[in-house]
Structure formats: structure tokens, C-alpha cells
Amino acid sequence: MSTVPVVQGAGSSNSAQDISTSSAPLTLKERISNLLSSTAFKVGLVVIGLLLVIATLIFLVSAASFVNAIYLVAIPAILGCVNICVGILSMEGHCSPERWILCKKVLKTSEDIIDDGQINNSNKVFTDERLNAIDGVVESLSRRNSLVDQTQ
């Protein structure tokens, strides 16, 4: 993007004072890409996930007397945990193996606590087999995102 100084002949050290001469609008794909790669969006994902988990814990107390109501509060909690992990994985554009290991631990521990309140590895959704099955997908997405970051 080229800029022209506000006052002709006088350069500006602050780019905010310069006027853009590029009149080409951003395409929808570029705008969405900029939004999804912004730090604010990624932090927002983590915050929304935390709010879902907190809301679930609040509703667990009131739903303790209903046997079937546990599924109504477990679903938002699992979605919140997944949302937190997506936010963690997408920070800085790529997923390192350490981050993926951290996310697997967060998902397994969260499900353990939500299902019966104890950490006893009684997982049914986030099992080692299921999480290991998507290792290749996470790895390929990480490589793709790191290549995109290098080109920018």
C-alpha cells in the first residue's frame, strides 16, 4: 500500500498521518482472513469458551436433582472446552506439538471433571484413540498456517 504525505514535500514518521492512495477495496476473503487471524478474535474464542464452561458449572448445581438434565449442561461444557482449545491452537497462527498435547490434556481433564466430578479417566468423548486419530489433521493445518504466515 503506498502512501502520500499529508503535506507535500514533508515526510511523516507516523504512518497514521499519511493518506492512502490505494483505492482497491479488500475482497471478502481478505477481510475474513484478516478477522480470523487477528489476536482479538482468537482471544474472543478463548473467552467464549470459558464463559460456556462457567455457565455449565453454574447450571450443574441446579440440574443435580434431574437425571436427564445433565446432558443439557454437558453439551455446552464440551463445546466450551473445544472452543478454548481452538483458541489456544490458533494463537500465533500455528499449532506446535506442545500446544496440541496441552489441548488434549485440557479436553480429557475437562470431560473427566464434567461427567462425574472426579479425575478417573472415565472419558467417553475425548479418549486417547479419538484424539490421536486427529493428530494428522492438526499437523497438516499447522503446516498450512505456518506457510501462510511465512508468505505474509
UniProtKB/Swiss-Prot annotation:
InterPro entries, per the entry: CRPA
UniProt keyword annotation of Secreted present: no
Disulfide bonds: none
Pfam families recorded: CRPA
GO CC annotation terms, alphabetical: outer membrane
Annotated membrane topology: Multi-pass membrane protein
Keywords noted in UniProt: Membrane, Transmembrane, Transmembrane helix
Transmembrane segments: 43-63, 69-89
Region of interest (Disordered), residue spans: 1-20
Subcellular location: Membrane
Record's protein name: Sulfur-rich protein, serovar C
Source organism (scientific name): Chlamydia trachomatis
